[in-house]
Structures are given as C-alpha cells and as structure tokens.
Amino acid sequence: MFKKPGLTFFVLISMALSLISGVWAAEIPNLKVGYIFTTHHTPFMVAAQKGEAFKSMGVYLRPVVPKDKYELVVNGKPIAVFQLIVTKSGAETAALFARKQLDLAMASVTAIMAGIDKGTPMKILSPLQTEGMGLVVPKDSPLTDWNSFLSYAKKAKQPVKIGYHSPTSAPKIILEGALKQSGIKVTEDPNDQSAQVLLADLKETTNMIPALASKQVEAIVGPSPFPEVAVSRGVGRIIVDLRDLPPAGYWHDFPCCVTAASDQTIAKHPDVVQKFVELIAKTNAWCNKNRLEAGTLTAEWIGLPADAAKASMLVYLPKFTESWMRGADKYMTILNQMGNFKGPLKGKTINEVKPTLFDMQFIDKVKL
C-alpha cells in the first residue's frame, strides 16, 4: 500500500536543497561594486550596457536586474554577482570601504589615498582616466579665463566662494594647489575674511549646478560631465580646463579615478578581482576607440544631455603609465603640503608607499 511522504522526507529534501544552494552561493560570490554618476566612470557603465557584445573580450557583464545587479561572466560562466552601489563622491566611497559596505569600486585616486592613510584596508588596482575637470562660473559672469579669475580674487572685498563636491576630490585638490602656487590665500573657514578664496563643500556632484545657478557660489570646480552639463543647460561657462592651469604643462595627463578593492576581497576572491580589472582595462581601450558611442551610452545611463557627455575630453588608461605615476606623486606632494596626511602616507613619495597604496598583480597580468 502506498504511503504518503512523511515529514522526515520533506525535511531531508529541504536540507539537500539548502546544501546545494549553499554550495552554489559559495561558488558565486555576491560583491558590492561602487561607482559615481560621472563620465569618469564611463567604462564601467559601458561594460554594463554592452553586455554580451563584449563576449569576445573573454569577460563581460550580464544583466540580472538592469542598472542594479549583474553577473560577471568569464568564458560563458558566471563567476560573481555584482550589486551596483551608486555613491555621491570618492569620500563616501572610501567611507563605505571603511565600514565594509563595498568590495570593489571606482573613485578618485586622492579619495582612495586619503582612505588608506586613515587606515582603511583597501588597495588601488588600476587606472581609469586622466583629466576631465573644469572651473565653471555663471553664464553672466564677467570672468573669462584663469588670469581674469586671479585678478578678481585679488581685488574682491570678501573671499570668492567656489563650490566642490568632495573634500578629497581631484578637482578640488588640483584647484587648491594651483591657487596656492599663484599666491592666492585659500580657506575653508567661512569666518576667515583674510582669505581670497573660500572653498565650500557642496557634499555631492548633484548639488554643484543648482548651487551655481542660484548664486550660492561664484564658481564650481568638478569632474566631467558637470562642467559640460552647466554649459549645456545655459547655467555656466567653463573658464579653464584644469589641465591648463599654471605652471604650464604641470597638470597635463593628471590622474583622477581608479579602481579599488578591499583587502578582504583581494584575499578571498582574487580570481574575481583579476577579471574585474581585466574587464575595466579592456573597456578603457574600447572607449578610447569608440568615443562617440561611449559618450552616448554614458548619457543614456546617467540621464544627461547627449552633447554634454560627448563633450567630455577624457583619456582612459588601460594600464598605469610613467606620467600617471608622476601625477600621483604630485598629488602626494600637494596633499602633504596641505597637511592632509596623518598616517602612513605622511611625508612620503609615491615610490615609498607603492606597496601600501597599490596591488598591481592584477593589472600586470592583463593582456590587451
């Protein structure tokens, strides 16, 4: 006589399924990947949108939930699931790493440097791009270039207020360095009326253009595409690309954003980190060859005017270069002169702290 399956049978089946799913979950790690709505992170957004079109690269992203969750696929097999996290700035990215709420991310090299100096266990993996930063004034401002800005700052009766999106952002640090080299006294204290320029923290990129439009600040300094968007919306004018700041040639090919990973992620999932670095490096090369399409895809992803994204003059780097390292060393010098470093980076050059800042084993293995 046939007996109905008992409770024990169902318990055993449930346990078996749990074990199978547990093994599967262990094989496919779920990692949180942070990025910012900026054209500096175009390669990651392009990789997500192109998907299987990049299959020939040997590594690509397959959407699970578009713009939210993706599988990292290698030779047709998923090796990880990426949960995308949009951050407001490099400073927030570093803070999320410190709280163990990110595994991989893209952010400015200066933000990652600052985080590592504070003791956050993470490493720079590879470069993303150089340049793509500008100083923007309101459309009706009489200022036309760097020299007219300096003249105005020296004659103004109170500090000229310039907004930035993050205290550890590359645009803010470059501008501050250039101002000081030009003999301009800079402060972040609104009560310091002896200064000629007041730098104001606007907290995130989305606040920059509204602050400029409302005359909350007299200028903004930030990464692409925000200077270009200000122009496209008729709100502002770019009076200087930061690469052209004095001294002549000093700021050319200056580093900005990088990829980074927590030390824990590197230790636990080196195979995933390797393929993530490979994907970004190969997509960087693709973006350099397909600038128009890359700009269009970025505009669609972020929700920008297409002309603004396409106007970004960025150079994406598949590998570290000598000029990139020289620029990173200049950042170290500037940040030390400002007294920003209190930890292991204090008083050091880039060569002295490479093992502290970088894990280059992954990018060194990438064949383009």
What are these regions (language model features)?
Residues 10-19:
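Bacterial N-terminal signal peptides
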Residues 30-31, 37-81, 86, 91-92, ...:
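Short, polar/charged alpha-helical segment
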Residues 24-32, 55-57, 77, 143-161, ...:
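Immediate post-signal peptide segment of exported/extracytoplasmic ligand-binding proteins
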Residues 110, 204-298:
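Pocket-lining segment of extracytoplasmic ligand-binding domains
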Residues 267-342:
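Secondary-structure end/capping motifs
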Residues 65-95, 108, 186-214, 223-225:
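Short helix-initiation/N-cap motifs at beta->coil->alpha
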Residues 109-110, 121, 127-210, 214, ...:
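A conserved helix-loop-strand patch within extracytoplasmic ligand-binding domains
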Residues 336-368:
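Conserved C-terminal helix/tail region of periplasmic/extracytoplasmic solute-binding proteins
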